[in-house]
Amino acid sequence: LNGQYRRPTGIVGRIIAGRMAQQHQPENAWTVSLLHVQPSDHILEIGFGPGTTIQRLAMLTSEGHVTGIDYSSTMVSLASRRNARAIKAGRVKLCRGNVVNLPFANHTFDKVLSIHTLYFWQEPLRALAEIQRVLKPGGTLALTILPREKWPGGGTGTEYCIVYSGDDVVKLMLDAGFTSAHVEPCPLPTQFRELSVIGIK
């Protein structure tokens, strides 16, 4: 089952996607708010899952564009149906791919976000360097995670995922070339124990 969270597939993957869409809606909305999205922004979401945050971003970028990349072809299919109208209008583009090899030109995006995916990145430093590459100068990355100290089982992770503290992620971002990075604790009720690390190119 843990492997399904890394790359949801088939019927089980679709069930997990439905659970994710409902369970993570509050922190997804909070993460979007941290980006201070402007109507003309070009935004990338990495690991968009069922596509609910893509849908939210599309509503906020009436003069811009939203791109999503996900490791799971099941999620690409599901999110494409959810966002079919915006895709047809040319305002959203979704594709399957890997964060360590983003198929975008340098300086493409104003903002990038990724929510609950860092744990599954096999090469986090390389991935963050790729994100830094595709961000415009001064662009913002919001990376939302459940930090190690809040992780079930004492923060040891599993064979499928690696867990991090906020400070770990700050260091990774700076090592990847971001000019600054800081931790934003989640202000939502206590059942939401996430934080977001904000990096500026």
Predicted feature residues:
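Conserved alpha-helix/loop element of class I SAM-dependent methyltransferases that forms part
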Residues: 22-41
